Regions:
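Conserved hydrophobic/aromatic beta-strand scaffold that supports enzyme active sites
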Residues: 5, 13, 21, 30-32, ...
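Loop-centered beta-sheet repeat module
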Residues: 1-47
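Glycine- and acidic-residue-biased ligand/ion/polar-headgroup-sensing regions
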Residues: 1, 27, 111-146, 152-154
């Protein structure tokens, strides 16, 4: 009656600005990109989960009620927060799309689909990436700033700002299958 359910499938992207009631459903793998996921979260319900101390985790009904944005109905959420992808660029064997985050967030996220090597640039900021499709990829530096390394599905890796250019390529194991990464950085 008071909360809507939005079925999620692989590679869906949900923007969750402050004040949005949300949870993940059973059997869902979630990649949460957030600056403060546990500092400012007011749990309205916690499904009976226990904390590290073995006690039920606290809920914050009074605080939560005060920060809910009550103007966000199901129609608004579907129009503004679900799968708001925007094509940005494409080249030989790759395409880039802006996935969010919400305009109130200071983090930018992009998804790259690729079947060929893709050149990236840190833009002077730290890049945090996750391989969200495909078994494995190779990350290397055209300038030799670091030793090449392999990332596997669902692994997160960080590229320091000082690296500049770096490349992500399908591994021999991934040949013939599209891969995808999510890249996040602090907006300037």
């Amino acid at each position: 009656r008071f909360v809507n359910r939005i079925p999620a499938k692989k590679h869906d992207h949900f923007l969750i600005p402050a004040g949005t009631v949300h949870c993940s459903g059973a059997g869902t793998m979630v990649l949460e990109i957030s600056a403060t996921p546990y500092i400012f979260t007011f749990k309205l319900w916690d499904w009976g989960r226990l904390g590290l101390d073995g006690l039920p985790r606290p809920v914050h009904l009074e605080h939560g009620e005060k920060v809910i944005d009550w103007q966000r109905d199901a129609q608004w959420v579907h129009q503004h927060l679900v799968n708001q992808f925007e094509p940005v660029a494409e080249g030989n064997g790759w395409r880039e799309e802006r996935t969010g985050l919400h305009e109130r967030e200071f983090i930018e996220t992009r998804r790259h689909w690729f079947s060929e090597p893709v050149l990236h640039h840190t833009g002077g900021g730290v890049n945090v990436l996750n391989l969200v499709e495909g078994d494995e990829a190779i990350v290397d530096s055209p300038t030799g700033a670091f030793e090449p390394f392999t990332v596997h599905y669902a692994e997160t890796f960080i590229i320091p700002a000082s690296v500049g250019d770096y490349r992500i390529s399908p591994s021999a194991r991934a040949s013939g299958h599209p891969l995808a990464t999510i890249k996040a950085w602090v907006r300037s």
